[in-house]
Amino acid sequence: MAAKEIKFGRTAREKMLHGVDILADAVKVTLGPKGRNVIIDKSFGAPRITKDGVSVAKEIELEDKFENMGAQMVREVASKTNDIAGDGTTTATVLAQAIVREGNKAVAAGMNPMDLKRGIDLAVAEVVKDLQAKAKKISTSEEVAQVGTISANGDTQVGKDIAEAMQKVGNEGVITVEEAKTAETELEVVEGMQFDRGYLSPYFVTNPEKMVADLEDAYVLLHEKKLSNLQAMLPVLEAVVQTGKPLVIIAEDVEGEALATLVVNKLRGGLKIAAVKAPGFGDRRKAMLEDIAILTGGTVISEDLGIKLETVTLDMLGRAKKISITKENTTIVDGAGQKSDIEGRVAQIKAQIEETSSDYDREKLQERLAKLAGGVAVIRVGGSTEIEVKERKDRIDDALNATRAAVQEGIVPGGGTALLRSSTKITVKGVNDDQEAGINIVRRALQSLVRQIATNAGDEASIIVGKILDKDNDNYGYNAQTGEFGDMIAMGIVDPVKVVRTALQNAASVASLLITTEAMIAELPKKDSAGGGMPDMGGMGGMGGMM
């Protein structure tokens, strides 16, 4: 085991605070509408330019191990806030730095760190209640666009794209952000359920120009096993032919004789048909087949349920107004499933999302939820250079997450105004002077956002804070973009409650841990042993006889 270096008390906290300051100072320059960019060197390729707090935080690694510990703790604040709310990473970093700085001063003055922590916790709980009480629910597309615009640093087009996407696919729908191949940013919406499996044979195509199989008002047969021959299916195939409607078979696989027979019948024109592999694997495949069954009002043909292919009747098949199948994807639009059944399935998947601890499972469940609940929208981010595209993609990701958070918990006045106002509403009292000091630490820290936004805009922070607090209106704040004071919500400058709340709670949590730290342990740096050079050759004097 390597030897360790240990630092105690004030020395430890000062080292840690220095690390916190280095990371926070690099991140906080990005805050607000006039925040600056940070350029990050890459080991290969062009450097990356970003205004995304968490991207900056993730790149910082300090040489001094004790300083690095402080920096990494604050990095954790940014990452955790990003994971939960999807935005607010810079906010969380600024708050954490402010609480740690003030807390460190209090500990150095001889106050009890544990009482300071209790005071901080009391104040944060009261601020969270105040934020939730002030929250304004958002409903219109304009309000959604406002949130997106603010989070994308004033890019109105981003706000509009996100609002349009959410309008088309619903609040639960999946919206993905991809890099475009062109200079323009565009929005593409896929309505209905789409999964990543295409036709099993190109002979099923109905539109040879586009290589797409479009089947209108089709029946859907869902089978969880492989289909190798069609003998067992003949009764149901004949019943479908009688109706004159097309049929889409979704099964684990359709192979050999079964596939050949279907293709021959399709080419002869007797049967409008297409076959597709079922999406997913294992248990997830079963669940997704069940989702498709509920969406189309059909039944999954499964031995587990005691249903055999021979006994399948027309009413066990699903129905859909339109099914489009390309080489890679299948899209089911307007399934005939009962609304109540779909809502029940959505509620069931939501419950599974709450319970799961795996990020991968959660992501897959959210995809399934979106496919049932609305559809999928893709925002393709364009730009003149690769660096510009990456920077815009960062901003759109943030804006999208902020917008989702706003829909969930509502909005409050932006620009740090909500927290600044909350600092005057803290009425809770500590049981002793040290707890009271902890409450005051939070009061002062809540001003740090407005101060930093003003500083980044080149304004005098103290004057801005004073002017805002002079007015008794909760919505009154400072628009750093235009340099005007006024009603923040009317000006469209808003923050999602979830983002502000998460940032404050995470910042206070980690800052409290740093304040109550009394010892730090790190590995001693390894001493490099002297290099193993060539042995001494005695001045090479022994070579004289070689001449």
Curated annotation (Swiss-Prot):
Annotated EC: 5.6.1.7
Localisation: Cytoplasm
CDD domains documented for this protein: GroEL
Enzyme class: isomerase
UniProt cross-references to SUPFAM superfamilies, sorted A to Z: GroEL apical domain-like, GroEL equatorial domain-like, GroEL-intermediate domain like
Binding-site list for ATP: 30-33, 51, 87-91, 415, 495
Keyword vocabulary terms for this entry: ATP-binding, Chaperone, Cytoplasm, Isomerase, Nucleotide-binding
InterPro entries: Chaperonin_Cpn60_CS (IPR018370), Cpn60/GroEL (IPR001844), Cpn60/GroEL/TCP-1 (IPR002423), GroEL-like_apical_dom_sf (IPR027409), GROEL-like_equatorial_sf (IPR027413), TCP-1-like_intermed_sf (IPR027410)
One example GO MF annotation: unfolded protein binding
Quaternary organization: Forms a cylinder of 14 subunits composed of two heptameric rings stacked back-to-back. Interacts with the co-chaperonin GroES.
Function field: Together with its co-chaperonin GroES, plays an essential role in assisting protein folding. The GroEL-GroES system forms a nano-cage that allows encapsulation of the non-native substrate proteins and provides a physical environment optimized to promote and accelerate protein folding.
Family per similarity comment: Belongs to the chaperonin (HSP60) family.
Protein name: Chaperonin GroEL
